[in-house]
Amino acid sequence: MKKILLLLAMLGFLYAEDGVKKVVFDLTTGDTKVFKQKVLSGISNQKSYYEGKLEELKVAVVIHGDAYKFFIKDLDNSPYKKDTALVKESQEIEQRLATLAKNNNVEFLMCESGMKHNNIDKTTLYNYVKITPNATIGLIDKQSEGYVYIPIKD
């Protein structure tokens, strides 16, 4: 047992980068208030905190559940076209997401399996959204790279 624990600790050190923290958010919420608080504001605040400590925070967000709607640029050609509250806020959401992707290097990974299930075409997504075969694979991959898991749900 001690050998297994020692091996796991050594593997953790292999993935750890000096001064770099890593987090993967498991984003499933469709609640706009929660999304804005935890993703749009929360990630910026967390990045600023670690920058103030002269440390880097790498962030990945795995998108599935009810969260697809926040990452679609063409709502008129999506299952969310009748969500008037979302349509009204979509421009602000897109600008803030683009800032997170571009200026803060946040990686957004969307579940392809759920996209197919919800009839969401890749061409309707923002260009900074990457596709992962499914949410579980995206989460496993990031956790295998040393990312800490945090869920964001309703």
Outline where the language-model segments fall.
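Sec-dependent N-terminal signal peptides
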Residues: 4-13
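Secreted/extracellular ectodomain signature
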Residues: 17-154
